[in-house]
């Protein structure tokens, strides 16, 4: 079995990140380490496959629809705020939150209550930062 880490490189957009989530889902639920980055790292890692992902509206809409339907609007809004943040590993955060919520033995709509989980905690912090920045911009 191949346990090589997969690094998905995508554009810095919600559509690009959600397409990468769609592509990386099958590896992530099998326990393979998957990272989603918005730009190529300066130092490449050994034993990693770097895969460029092109945005696909249909795949991104499927991911968004699944989040809204199975996890609710609060989780969807939170993940959209994370996608709008300037954090470089925001794609990985979104993927890991979804794997924990929808994967085998997932907690579903209560995922945002798992504050001790580092990915959920960081997602909520990024949501707050982006929300404050947005409301500071609009006055």
Name what the model sees in each region.
Residues 31, 73-76, 132:
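Intrinsically disordered or highly flexible coil/loop and linker segments, enriched in small
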Residues 1-2, 39, 43, 74, ...:
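Alpha-helical context
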Residues 24-25, 84, 88, 121, ...:
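Phosphate-binding glycine-rich loops and adjacent basic patches that engage nucleotide phosphates
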Residues 2-6, 47, 51, 78, ...:
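Generic preference for well-ordered secondary structure
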Residues 2-55:
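N-terminal ordered "arm"
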Residues 56-112:
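A basic- and aromatic-enriched beta-loop-alpha substructure that forms the phosphate/nucleotide-
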Residues 103-139:
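Internal, well-folded beta-alpha domain core
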């Amino acid at each position: 079995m191949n346990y090589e880490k997969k690094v998905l490189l995508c554009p810095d957009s919600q559509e690009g990140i959600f397409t990468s989530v769609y592509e990386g889902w099958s590896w992530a639920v099998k326990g393979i380490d998957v990272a989603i980055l918005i730009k190529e790292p300066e130092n490449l890692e050994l034993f990693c496959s770097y895969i460029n992902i092109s945005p696909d509206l249909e795949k991104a809409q499927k991911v968004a629809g699944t989040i809204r339907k199975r996890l609710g609007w609060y989780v969807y809004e939170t993940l959209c705020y994370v996608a709008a943040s300037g954090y470089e590993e925001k794609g990985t955060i979104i993927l890991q939150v979804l794997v924990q919520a929808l994967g085998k033995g997932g907690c579903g709509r209560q995922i945002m209550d798992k504050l001790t989980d580092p990915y959920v905690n960081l997602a909520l912090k990024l949501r707050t930062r982006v929300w404050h920045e947005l409301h500071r911009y609009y006055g």
